[in-house]
Amino acid sequence: FMVYTEGEDGEMQDFEVKYVFGFSPLQQYMVEFDRPVDMPPTEVARVQVLRITWDTLKEKWFYLRPPDVPEKLEPDDPLHWTGVAQRWQTMCADCHSTNLKRNFDPAEQAYHTTFSEIDVSCEACHGPGSLHLELANSKSLFWDRRHGYGLAKLKGENAETQLQTCAPCHSRRGVLSEGFHGGDEFCDFYNLELLRDDTYFADGQIKDEVYVYGSFIQSKMYHKGIRCTDCHDPHSLKLKSPGNETCTSCHQHAAGKYDVPSHHHHVPGTAGAMCVNCHMPHRTYMDVDKRRDHSLRVPRPDLSVALGTPNACSGCHVKDQLKSIDQQKQPSLLEYADWIEAAEAGDEQVAAAVLKTDEWCDAACEKWYGENRKQPKHFSEAIVAFRNGEPGAMNELLRVATQPEELTPVLARASALGELAASGVGNVTAK
């Protein structure tokens, strides 16, 4: 297949589509550049990912634009499809192939990339399988128990091994060193993204494309030992149970505690009665991929009123304010994230509508729960105050940074330390 589009020199030309990859409903197309005629068939040269994309469900083409970049991309822009930010080797291959070796030659400025399988295969999670095969093919009558199965031990009482095996491809992180295998320590090889203003909201909710590990380790579920495979099939990644059963399969409390109107205050069977819509709100990435926040938090419209952070209640109810918005703006407000982004960008009309919704939701929670409503102090209050330069904010952020794990998630504490360090405050030690 061929595509006729603008090349890295700015000229329109034909390119051969060499590979196709993606995850339903996203299907993307790749073009190989600079391949020498004598390159072995087992090696891959520089590969660039086209921005023209196919939606397999809606069966239509669409342009996958970068976030917050509405204008046309010039050929010298890193975000142009021929640029480094659209390069398969640096942006995609780590998590969409197995045993990747980039083999970049700086002298030649060329790639000689290899991989075992162009997919997420067994060894991507279970580690090298050579010992496992050796044991399986052994003619000995006895299994060598010293080696177990010859694979990474992802099961057991400790959930950390499994979580840290999933984390490299389900987190936003920088690479510290190469060679991670299933069962290794995540932080020995990667630097996890902190709660920076452009990637997370101040309260730790997902904002930019940060995937799920960073949000999950903030959750009470994580601290209670819940692991990925408690909810997801490890091989298909599909949920093990439908609907609210994903949650009630563990939350088997006395009848009438959770999956009933007295708890969720919505009509059974509606969107508002779904556990995930309140505790795991979604944002859409890459135009078609809805990803849920895995911090599994209780909605806090009170924090939204005070700090401008999102909350799941307003996520559903903000659309009730659409008629108050100028008609020409309405088509751009398709999702809650669009409202939040417009408000943050300075649209006073949209910001007022969002705040009105937050206040309405906060009042509803107050009416429902009254004196039983829990509004504990949250680390986001200190982070926002510090960023705004408020008096006494440094001491509050120091308090967050030095709190024990059971009071404040380690990612929030590390982020507090990062904020303090960036401001020039030194000699801070977290326990």
Would you name each region that the model predicts?
Residues 1-22, 28-33, 45, 49-76, ...:
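Primarily the internal scaffold of c-type cytochrome electron-transfer domains
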Residues 383-384, 415-418:
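Residue-level signature of alpha-solenoid helical repeat scaffolds
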Residues 89-103:
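Conserved catalytic alpha/beta cores of large enzymes that bind or transform nucleotide phosphates
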Residues 83-85:
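Exposed beta-sheet edge/beta-hairpin loop segments within beta-rich domains
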Residues 425-430:
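Flexible loop/turn segments at the boundaries of HEAT repeats in alpha-solenoid HEAT proteins
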Residues 413-416, 431:
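Conserved hydrophobic register position within alpha-solenoid helical repeats
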Residues 77-81:
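Membrane-interface segments at the starts/ends of alpha-helical transmembrane spans
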